[in-house]
Amino acid sequence: VSAKFATSGQDCLAANRFYIERPIYDAFVEAFTEKVRALSVGPGLEDPDIGPLINARAVAKQEEHVADALKQGARLLCGGTRADIGANFFPPTVLADVPCDALVFREETFGPIAAFSPFDSADDVLQQANDTETGLVAYLHTQSPARIAQFTRLLEFGMVAVNRTKITGAPIPFGGTKQAGLGREGSRMGMEEFTNVKYVCGDTH
């Protein structure tokens, strides 16, 4: 839940697409939705779980993504319409059975929408996960060492978090692939971005 709804989803590291293995899909989505329904929405001074979005355009984007997903056959499990406590508030929203070509799967939502889809095989979910123009971070949750090795090798993302949701810090080479930026911030690699490389060739005779 925190991987999606921290900072109301307005975070480049926020999980956009949730792929859950089919045998546990229904139970997982139900448990996830129950926790999301318990999240509070309100002004920041009231210490809510979900605060306002940055502007009206951000709220309109949430509405567009929800409407598009529902039009394509997704199920709305909670949220989905702007909150009545203020113009820029949108409640935490869960969508299930989202098709791969829905806007919420094709664009970065930057808002409190969690979109779910089931998968049947490793090849299936890897193809879907990598089918994106951006590749900043992927979150992998599994108890299988073999699957960890397979997915961390084949996921086309600059960072992969395994069985955790926090992946920031000064020692980390923060950055992505594809349209998620060039170079790295943080770590030795990040420092090298601010240096000039000089090659000297010669001898002392």
For each feature predicted by the language model, list its residue ranges.
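ALDH superfamily catalytic-core signature
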Residues: 1-99, 162
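Conserved C-terminal structural/oligomerization subdomain of aldehyde/semialdehyde dehydrogenase
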Residues: 37, 66, 82, 89-205
